[in-house]
């Protein structure tokens, strides 16, 4: 016959339970006399008791929960009848370990909330009728995700998102706001949104485009603000992000975060301690924020997280350990500072490097110098490292530098780049968007590359890698007769009018002359075999191209946006109709 084991009758429990009970009893006694005790459950740290009545009560709840679960496992094994959850809750309420409200939450939701003290203890219920909301009910957990507000916002100055929905007479806990553009229904709501405590996630694109809301109150129960959540909320002027939020966006290693992207009137962001990760483009175009006080807890900053902002100085706190290339751009930036206790990064004359000064990460856009020599400890220049530099005209790349990232000089006023001897693998990509370049020079000791009249070639000049866009303005450029291949994007956005291609050239690479808006004449010689993808796209001033009979391949996208092509059978002349 099954014997019911009373929860407090420790002596009738199996041996393992007696030991658990004894240990937990000692722990509780120590807590009650003021000793700090850390309790680990299932190998994980659950809570630390501090010198406060509320923390002691919280620890008691955890200890009682562990004992109850341990006894339940054992009694199930031996076929005995254990204390039910209802009996457990009722007993803890009588002993004033649990409040009435907390007991109700445990009975409704189980123990899933017990490790979230801010939800379990002294939480406030904001119950709303389900008729005002679109929602999704997870029947396994009984948790609700709110996806849309169905009511009217007329005459409202404040809208509260509830933490409980009344569905068919029963209350269900709301844990998440979700749904792409879920709040477009309040796009014209000119007021403050209050998210009730207990909601743990602000889902993807939840408030995207709700451009008239003036404020959002985020509770400290929220642990994740997902991608695009507040994108283009253009009336937001201030936001507080609680320390419970560990991640602002899901992706730090690409540009898909965009949590507050386009919040163009945002002036103040309060980051509380606890935040660890800021995703890609999280605060892109938040140009009115005058100071970014990042928390000490921050560990990772994503790609373009602070793109197109407006500050003169930017500070990296002490615990940041990962910074994605291209994390920062500001047209007013003069200086990047790094906390002296940071183990991973440093600043030299306002320029951001890794701690050992082997990686140049960020050169400020508005730094005053017209020339700069990269330190000889650096081996890598990050992508977009010199983006939009206004005053820099000449840069000397040290022999130690082996790699230059894509678009490293994009949008800058640079005229001259002097490459050292360490560069062993380079293409056109680092120079992409550097439209003011007139000269790319290579030190003669470089074994892989050389230059002639400011044009970059491989060693031996068989491949033309990059002709600087501003090297010749309105003149003719004749490619050396050693060249066999014109590399991809080699003349991209060049100002040149006429290019003469010798018979040695066999291949014109992808986008070689892409967007050469001034190019009027391109002379192709017999011997040319291939014209690749978009090679002449948007060269709108070219009227006629004479294609030699040696050509065996022309990509179908080659002449796009140049007018209709008349393809003669003999391929000798392709006339372009305006």
Model-predicted segments: where are they?
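Structural signature of tandem-repeat unit edges
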Residues: 137-144, 154-176, 187-201, 211-224, ...
